[in-house]
Amino acid sequence: MHYLIWPLVKFLVAFIIVQVIVAAMNWIERRLLGLMQARLGPNRVGSEIGIPWGLGQILADPIKFLLKEDIVPSSAEKVAYYLGPMMSILPALIVFCLIPYGPPPTFAPTQVNVGLLLILALTSTSVYGIILGGWASNNKYSLMGALRSAAQMVSYEVPFGLSIVGVLMISGSLDLVKIVRYQEMHVWNLFPQLVGCFTFFVAMNAENNRTPFDLPEAESELVAGYHTEYSAMKFAFYMLGEYSGMLVNCCLFTVLYLGGWTLCIAEWGITTTSLSKLGIVGGLIGAAIFIAKVMAIMMVYIWFRATFPRFRFDQLMDLGWKWMIPLALANIFVTGIILLALPAVEVGGIWHWLGEVILSIAGAAIIAFTLFLLTRTAKPARRIPAHAG
């Protein structure tokens, strides 16, 4: 019986943790955007009862969604209309149960040999909730947003998956815990897999429909995109799905490229072995390190939103098919050549560090060359001819 109860407990714990973090993320994002745009952001709610810095906004938002009127279009396909928001958030919650956020076994809830492959399969299903909601709303703006989201997901799922192949080649495993342990014995994959890291970050922004890739819900073009006809808690589920997807991608980025819950390398830093000797205290230390890295990636997410304007749809497709996919393939090619050229030696040997350095330099060179080509091949701005009269 416990085989049925234990997964359910994990899912409920993941749901509670994710929703608390998502609520805090929303407040942090609004405050940081306020600072970046030379304004205050939410800083008043809760001050009457002694809650500082506007932190009461974290509680005010869910209360607002609970109390708002729930309007359902009369022409909507009811079953699909209600399924859309739920299917949008469910994959992120399941994936969160698979990500190790601390040293095993306590802080790695489910260790799967093909965990990374399973995560890629699950994250790609979140688009079905968007497509269902857009189609079932029986609204032209919603349908257009859903179609945009489908095209965007197809375009960026390819570089999203290809960017991870380099990590699999050097670590030799699909198990996320083993990938973290490889990094603590070598060096963070951020350095030897610089191109894959760059491609992965761009692709995960696009998969989450975040600015500058937010064309499925472009307010200036499609009112609110696929969730135009949603209100109250159904709209909140779509918002939670977006932020939960952001959180999952930041966790995945931390595991794949930033060494997970470890610091530095085995000879000097905090490793899985050293944390395991401290028991639950070591687990909490590892989880705190992991959360700090995730929050750092989240800050970059927000920085991107505040910095870059929205792409046109043709620019979005060009970036995915003409630049990100070739970049990811080049990373796989270079990684394979270096792994074949250099012999397998012990950790810390001259050949080991030579391979890491060559991969890092090659990655930086590829990114620099790509940025140079982008500036040389940029399309001229479209100009409207002057009125003859």
Named regions from a protein language model:
Residues 1-389:
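Selective transmembrane helix interface/packing segments
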